[in-house]
């Protein structure tokens, strides 16, 4: 069966590295395929981004479906008030204690609650990782500004202190999911609730629409996509993505620069 004949499938799509490249160039060929598929299927963007910085891609695709933000910590439907919003947060007290106990090695940090952005300070280190457009920015000491639990948090440190911060955060691994990563010599520890994942969000959306998991497809390139790619029927990793998901995903497709998503649908027999 060709992709044009697909009907009542849930198709989950990561944004960065899947439909846009590292320079934010949009894969228009894949966008057009997704637009065509959205006529008879549920297209769900599944991203670590907040809503405000994924909204443009939701609108570009002209979607009428739920969206997964913060890697599953916030799931909502911008056009359907009957869809029950799902928000999972991290314990504020653990986050504040982590910051206090490691204040000598932390360079900067931020956390978000929907589109409220709590930031320790603005500097060149953090600028590439935050989207101020549409955000309600709250600056300063989190002990004074943060009044409730957040969707997640990102903490910046030096290379020499990276392992120390990871090891400390792992003391709370029963409550907090830790994702350490490095990007262009920036060392980051990302924190989420242990109960969040893109996979869990996808299964909840399948239940809402009464879609069998045999009718699920997902595309992604990062380690945060692994659970999503392994919970669906057709999990597709983008070439050039994280080595672990390339090993574990059932299918691979060319990179976003080579219009991998579009090529998969055009060449695959379902």
Regions found by a protein language model. Give the residues of each.
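Mg2+-dependent phosphoryl-transfer enzymes with acidic/Ser/Thr/Gly-rich catalytic loops
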Residues: 2-8, 26-27, 190-270
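Active-site metal-binding loops of divalent metal-dependent hydrolases
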Residues: 17, 49, 220-222
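Short, structured coil segments at secondary-structure junctions
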Residues: 61-63, 71, 171-173, 231-232, ...
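Asp-based phosphoryl-transfer active-site loop
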Residues: 7-24, 45, 229
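Active-site phosphate-binding/coordination module
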Residues: 25-126
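Short active-site oxyanion
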Residues: 40-44, 63-65, 151-152, 214-215, ...
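Conserved acidic, metal-coordinating active-site core of Asp-based
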Residues: 105-108, 112-219, 223-226
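Non-catalytic pre-domain segments flanking phosphatase-related domains
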Residues: 1-13, 32, 36
